[in-house]
Amino acid sequence: MCNLYAQIASQDRLRHVLDAVVEDDDEVIEDLTGNLPAQPGIFPDYPAPIVRRTPSGVQLMRARWGMPSPPQYLRTARDPGVTNIRNTASPHWRRWLGPANRCLVPLTAFAEPCGTGRGNQWFALADDRPAFFAGIETRGWRSLRKVRDGETMDDLFAFLTTAPNAEVAAVHPKAMPVILTTPADWQTWMGADWAEARHL
């Protein structure tokens, strides 16, 4: 399960890549991130950049990593969030699988645990192509993430996982994140019906 990744591409580069996400010249690209620093280590429950759809185009903004947990798995009022989503057939996740709740999560590398006491193995593309996790997001969700903070209202995200490729399977045979590397795949993820998008 991927609970650590990096996003060190420059803010300017991310803005440039967004041109390939929009589908027509009338769409607006809005950057709400302010001064977006490189993030060499992104951990669960911390803010990270995502790209999401709006009625007028796309937004680059920050959201908190961890979608709402299925209620049956919560033992207390505290919800630590779910970072990786594999069972898309679950009714809990189906409500967020439509285009209105899909997002792209920029990354430059991700880590999988090597086993107890053995650290992490990092994975990255061999070239310098921009890459995104296939993510889902929800806006304005009220939950208790940290007891000391009390209930908060946050924009949340997580990303989908799939069967691992050969490189990742050697370290983590269960799953790996769904990674999208082409403008066509980005547009399909952001706009196609689930019947088509689920095959990415």
What does each model-identified segment do?
Residues 1-200:
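Short linear sequence motif anchored by a di-proline
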